[in-house]
Amino acid sequence: MLRVNVIKKDSHRDIKYDIFMRLNRGAVTLNYQELRNCLYRGNLNDAAKELCKENEDFLAILKQKQPHQRYLDVEFIIRYFAFSDNISRNENGDVCLAGYRGKLVQFLNEYMDGHKNCSPEEKQSYKERFNETIEKVVIVFGTDKAFRDISSDNNKIYKTIADFIMPSFERMTKEYIESNKEMIYTRLVNFLRIDEIQDSISKRTSDRDIVNLRLRMWFKEFEDAITL
């Protein structure tokens, strides 16, 4: 007897993703973002892919001359939007990532599924937000130091550093960043020297408490410049 799974347009996203994962056993296994590219097509996905082609500073930060063939840069962008759009305060007034349960893959899947069919105006807003935030990041860190552990000689890109830098910079004015770029740079160096933070960017990085620790402590550094 042959078992047949029928995927309908209105099938639950977790069912679709599970079936794709079960089928994903070929010679070249698809990564998570390649699966999302199949499952969550729409204006949000298009916006992220267009940004990977158009934003030269972003490509320079990643040391890429062209978009990544397997959409790792697209995932970087989606991750930023998912984090930034869910920054909130808990009942104690601490900054946290609302709705995050410690499962990053599921969190990004849910975000893409919920926003895949955004309007053309929303798509343009996504692109403007990203471009403006990357511009601010480059003002402070340039393309060589952005999202790196600048407290050491390590030149690796840390998505875990981008997770708190990007949402915070989005909420700071360009004028504030231009006037305080040396202070911000130094503050990040000192922040990354904290043992607790150093552990958080490389160990159990998607754990809910660890994610919220990074956000809470970094946003607290800029309470005078960020309003939530």
Regions found by a protein language model. Name each.
Residues 48, 130-133, 218:
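Short, Φ-rich (hydrophobic/aromatic) sequence segments
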Residues 141-196:
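C-terminal hydrophobic structural anchor segments
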Residues 94-144, 150-153, 161:
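Small-residue-rich helix-loop
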Residues 1-109, 178, 182-213, 220, ...:
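Basic- and aromatic-enriched surface patches that contact anionic nucleotides/nucleic acids
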Residues 70, 123-130, 154-162, 177, ...:
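Short amphipathic alpha-helix initiation/capping segments at coil-to-helix junctions
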